[in-house]
Amino acid sequence: PNGCGKSTLLSHLYRLHPSKNKITLNEKPLESYKGREFAQLVAVLTQSRDAMIDDFLVKDIVLMGRYPYKQHFGTYSSEDVKIAEHYMNEVGITHLSNEEIHHLSGGEKQRVFIAKALTQKPQILLLDEPTNHLDMKYKVALMKQLRAFKGTTIVVLHDLNLAAQYCDHIVIMNNGTILKEGSPTEVLTPEILEPIFEVPFKTSWDEGRYHLYY
């Protein structure tokens, strides 16, 4: 539910230091990674956007995903440009490449930043509500793309049916606490969800897919 601590938990995974204990990546404390090294491993999509890039072109923002690989004072390589163009095509924004981002709709902007994260070619994607502002076509396309991603994806979602259909492992949170984690069918049950959301739930299988109704 809203305000349960999902975004805060995610932020700790991209180097917001916890007040106690440690978080490790590949058995190495997060705080020991240098910025460039960490950015080559982890790409992040947050809910906030930097207003300083409002006048940037779409293609330039997506190309920023290659920044962790750029040599000091160097320019982006032809391979960097090729990678950026590939992911712009993947998320359906090639036709917007020469537009300034402040001219775009919310859904179009979201796809730009998703393309930027993918252009980073990380091992891990951290995505905070990536389906926000997207219509159903692009929600489904994004989730299929994330399923095909070769690394690890950690995503905050409010759409429980999308989570049921595309996620392997689900963590349910409430009031800053992890209540339950496991497979979709283990976690997304009326017994667990009804006390949290205070609405009745039903579940069913349809053509091999697990669905929730409320």
How would you label these PLM feature ranges?
Residues N21-E31, F38:
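Conserved ABC transporter NBD signature motif
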Residues T75, E100-L104, E108:
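Conserved ABC ATPase signature
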Residues L63, S78-L96:
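Conserved ABC ATPase "signature" region
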Residues L125-E129:
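Catalytic Walker B motif of ABC-type/P-loop ATPase nucleotide-binding domains
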Residues P190, E194-Y214:
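ABC ATPase nucleotide-binding domains
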Residues L13-Y14:
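Helix-to-loop junction immediately C-terminal to a conserved catalytic motif
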